[in-house]
Every structure is written in structure tokens, then in C-alpha cells.
Amino acid sequence: MRTEESSYRDMYSKSRRSALPSGTEVPDFILRSTPDQWLTLSEFRGQPLVLAFYPADWSPVCGDQMTLYNEMLKEFHDLGAELIGISVDGAWCHAAFARDRKLHFPLLADFEPKGDVARRYGVYRDKDGVSERALFVIDAGGKVFWSYVSPIGVNPGADGILSALEELQSKNAKVAAGTK
């Protein structure tokens, strides 16, 4: 007999296996960053990037998560990284959410076709019509350095992102110095 908890565990473990793994070249995309502007992933080539997929604007956990990342922007920038949030909400919804939360990083609308980018990154929840709460650290060459899929109701915090960015920075410094 399957319990709700075991079904959740199965769904969670399946979603974790489907997220793009380390070393995978990330698919480029173009999404709305405002109702009249577009942003492409390729604009960030040459620098580390944090992609934070989240289920929906205005949900309590998503609001707390994006607010935390806004507070951590200086640390991300100090480690050479930019931050982008992505959900299936529309650009107008993102604009209101970002204004309300005083966010200072782009929120991209994976709205039409709904969830297309999340699907390509392996983090779309077909049953719910939203993306997983998934994090990717992408290196300057456009490959996944680190990824994590959090349970949908849990704020993953920023520690994993910071650790991955520090590790990436250390790796890059060793490569630049000619050591491995």
C-alpha cells in the first residue's frame, strides 16, 4: 500500500534524478524579464550564474526564498556570480512581486509556452503546472557545476549556493594558477 508520504518520496526522488546533472551544457533560452524586455541565458556567458527555479510568486516559501537571495546578492556578486529567478508566472506578476519584495535581480517568466525552460532543465512538475524549487550554479563556460532540487515546501536557503560558488571560484583559481 502506498502512503502519501511514500508517493511524495518517489515523486521527489524522480524529480531529483531528472534535473540536469553536473557537467551538462545548459540549454540557452530567451524569456521575458519585464513585460517589454527579454533576457537570454547566453548574455551571462563568461561568468558564473545562479538559476533559482521556484514554483510561484506570492507563495510564502517562494517569497521568503527570493527575499533571502536578494539579501545575499552582495555575497553572490563577491563570488563573481549573477542571480536569476525563474517561475511559470507571467512578466506582469513578476513585476508586481519584485516591486513588493524590493528584489534587485531579474525574475524571468517561463510562461509561454508554460514551463518550457523548466522542462529543458528537468525541473517541471507536470501534475502541478509549476517548476520544482531547483537551484543551478552554472560555470562561465555554460555547464552545470552544481544543482539541487529542494522539496517543494522547503526553502533551500543559500548555503548550498554559496558553497558551490566558493568551490567553483577555488577550482577556477587553481586552473588559472596551472594546478589541479
Pin down the residues of each PLM region.
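Chalcogenol-based redox active-site neighborhoods
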Residues: M1-K180
